[in-house]
Amino acid sequence: MATYANLAYFADNGGVIQCVDLNNLKPVWSINGFDDIDATLTIDIENDKPYVYCGNEVDHQGTRGISKIKKIDGLTGEVIWEKEFECESLIGKSAVNGGLMATNVIGKNNIYNMAIFSLARYNGFNKGGMFALNKENGEIIWEKLFDNYMWSSPVDIYDKDGNGYIIQGDSAGYLHLIDGKEGNIKSSVLLNGNIESSPAVFNNVLVVATRNGTIYGVKVK
């Protein structure tokens, strides 16, 4: 769930995106999000107006489908723009879905014009992709393809000059440090298992856990 003033925004497994007034718990608007939505919605404020960024996974669509990434007017529910990406999914009792599973990054400082999304099972069943989209029109500013898919949410960090970097974990256990402006990988470290948790960062230290049950503290420099 994401909130702005008295408004709460959330989505469900059926793909419905909703806005509720917290003062009276009455719905303000709702729209069809196309498929299951697990990634937390994010909010960016432009000219004192909230805009919601979100996207769906590939679940009810079957083994192959579309992840639709949206920018939505937070007051009216109007879709400002929408971008489609074809992704794959493993369905069944042991489902491992693709599409947008990770919460996006709303850029700040020198990447203020970007919303950055990580997609699972994009460009190949076990692969993934990261996309920096222009907040204004949804056009791709840069993209980075990965050999492994990502469920872990990317995290943005900034140096003293305001230069943005993205930290991204993947399904093979790699933790990447990425130049937020250009999308180039600056450094990578291999941990001992699939990274599904999202890193927590304080100053120049990040903490993240793997599916093998290990918690790591990693220094960024």
Predicted regions and their residues:
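Extracytoplasmic/lumenal domain signature
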Residues: 2-221
